[in-house]
Curated annotation (Swiss-Prot):
Contains 3 disulfide bonds. Belongs to the scoloptoxin-10 family. Keywords: Disulfide bond, Secreted, Signal, Toxin. This is U-scoloptoxin(10)-Sm3a. GO terms for molecular function: toxin activity. It is found in: Secreted.
Length: 105
């Protein structure tokens, strides 16, 4: 009985690892030039406040991820995620969050 439970959870764990490594994530994509340029412009404004710089970086990452599924999330989604906005590219369609979003709709 214990052997069966152990084998079951081992197989389940391995399947999850394989699935996790096979899906593409937003963090795995290289940052587009438009994203880095926009981030640099905002960081220049917050040069004297390092705490705001960290917050700006975090907000940009969050907005980039949100823009992948909703191009009207923020005004500059086409700069943050040109892979998905204004038109979804094959790279965009391979992302896990985009696949999940398309399944729901």
């Amino acid at each position: 009985m214990y052997k069966f439970i152990f084998i079951f959870f081992t197989v389940f764990f391995l399947i999850n690892i394989i699935e996790e490594s096979x899906t593409x994530k937003v963090e795995d994509l290289p940052l587009p030039k438009s994203y880095t340029n926009a981030l640099q412009q905002h960081l220049e404004k917050d040069k004297k406040r390092p705490d705001l710089q960290e917050l700006t970086k975090k907000n940009f990452k969050t907005n980039r991820k949100s823009c992948m599924t909703n191009c009207s999330h923020v005004e500059g989604c086409f700069l943050l995620s040109p892979e998905c906005c204004p038109k979804m590219t094959p790279t965009c369609l391979e992302l896990d969050i985009v696949k999940e979003h398309l399944k729901k709709n």
